[in-house]
UniProtKB/Swiss-Prot annotation:
Record gene name: rsmH
Protein's cellular compartments: Cytoplasm
Gene Ontology terms for molecular function: rRNA (cytosine-N4-)-methyltransferase activity
GO cellular component term, pick one: cytoplasm
Biological processes, Gene Ontology terms: rRNA base methylation
Function summary: Specifically methylates the N4 position of cytidine in position 1402 (C1402) of 16S rRNA.
Catalytic activity from the UniProt record: cytidine(1402) in 16S rRNA + S-adenosyl-L-methionine = N(4)-methylcytidine(1402) in 16S rRNA + S-adenosyl-L-homocysteine + H(+)
Principal localisation: cytoplasm
Gene3D superfamilies linked to this entry: Putative methyltransferase TM0872, insert domain (1.10.150.170), Vaccinia Virus protein VP39 (3.40.50.150)
Organism the protein comes from: Mycoplasma capricolum subsp. capricolum (strain California kid / ATCC 27343 / NCTC 10154)
Protein name from the UniProt record: Ribosomal RNA small subunit methyltransferase H
Length: 309
């Protein structure tokens, strides 16, 4: 099992601009790396709420956080229901919200959950095994070649979606993650197999996003998060691929009325009109060279920050 190191930890804590007495939400608890650092910075009057779909993650995080403070409450649920999950606890406004969108909670290192292309396991990939009946097995073994191709292209941005989909259908039945990896490899040219990135990464990403409806969930949650912020409250989002980036960028830019247009003489105009929100940083923050060396999970990570005026 990899040692889990939180991605962009110092940067996200810095830009969350934590107030001693504030109320904060970690929407992606995972192994509580970010949550621990938030909790350390709160006084006895501050409070942390943290959300995760995974019961195992909740249990492990509880033990870790209790060593720091008791000023927290862990919620098992999907952050698409952010407002409702907080309302149940009589919370209707907060000072900061954090999203770490990387799959870094315990599921990734447990083969039986089916998320890993390095550890053998069943074709599952459900974040919420209680309420979601759609598994990777269903897609891989029952969906049409065209449907699979569309999923891989749309959600994995996989250039070889067509050849991979064709090979998957020809290789059925496919019963495990590592068997799927071999099928994917057999569909790719040698030049791709020699690249640094794992050849199955994009396919597994596509399946995971589709099964868990991740993009719509993120969009819905961010809109709720904006409504929950107190004045000077901030949202920090750590993204890991261009599909997430596009959603965050669109929502943040539209919320701040931040735009760029071209005049007839090709001079760009940038404006931040009167708005409830402002972009704290105009361009997302990327990991330092040191972090990239020490934490392979940080590759492609970007931090985005917005503040309510």
């Amino acid at each position: 099992m990899d040692k889990h190191i939180p991605v962009l930890l110092d940067e996200s804590i810095k830009y969350l601009n934590i107030k001693l007495n504030g109320i904060y939400v970690d929407c992606t608890l995972g192994r509580a790396g970010h949550a621990s650092e938030i909790l350390k910075r709160l006084s006895q009057n501050g409070f942390l709420y943290a959300i995760d779909q995974d019961k195992t993650a909740i249990g492990q995080a509880k033990e870790k956080l209790e060593k720091i403070s008791n000023n927290f409450f862990l919620i098992q649920g999907n952050f698409s229901n952010l407002s409702a999950l907080l309302a149940i606890n009589h919370i209707f406004s907060v000072d900061g919200i954090l999203y770490d969108l990387g799959v870094s909670s315990p599921q990734l290192d447990i083969g039986s959950r089916g998320f890993s292309y390095r550890i053998d396991g069943p074709l599952d990939m459900r974040m919420d095994i209680t309420n979601n009946n759609l598994t990777a097995d269903t897609i891989i073994n029952q969906y049409s070649e065209t449907q699979i191709e569309d999923i891989l292209f749309k959600y994995g941005e996989e250039s070889f979606a067509k050849s991979i989909a064709k090979k998957i259908v020809l290789s059925r039945p496919i019963n495990s993650t590592l068997q799927l990896v071999e099928v994917i490899k057999s569909a790719l040219p040698q030049k791709v197999l020699k690249q640094k990135k794992h050849p199955a990464k994009k396919t597994f990403q596509a399946l995971r996003i589709f099964i868990n409806n991740e993009l719509i969930v993120l969009e819905n949650s961010l809109k709720q998060a904006l409504d929950l912020l107190n004045s000077k409250g901030r949202i920090c989002v750590i993204t890991f691929h261009s599909l997430e980036e596009k959603i965050v960028k669109n929502i943040f830019n539209s919320s701040t009325n931040y735009f760029q247009e071209q005049l007839f003489n090709n001079l760009p105009i940038k404006a931040n009109l009167n708005s409830q929100f402002k972009l704290v940083i105009k361009k997302p923050i990327k990991p330092s060279l040191l972090e990239l060396e020490n934490n392979h999970r940080s590759h492609s990570a970007k931090l985005w920050v917005i503040e309510k005026n």
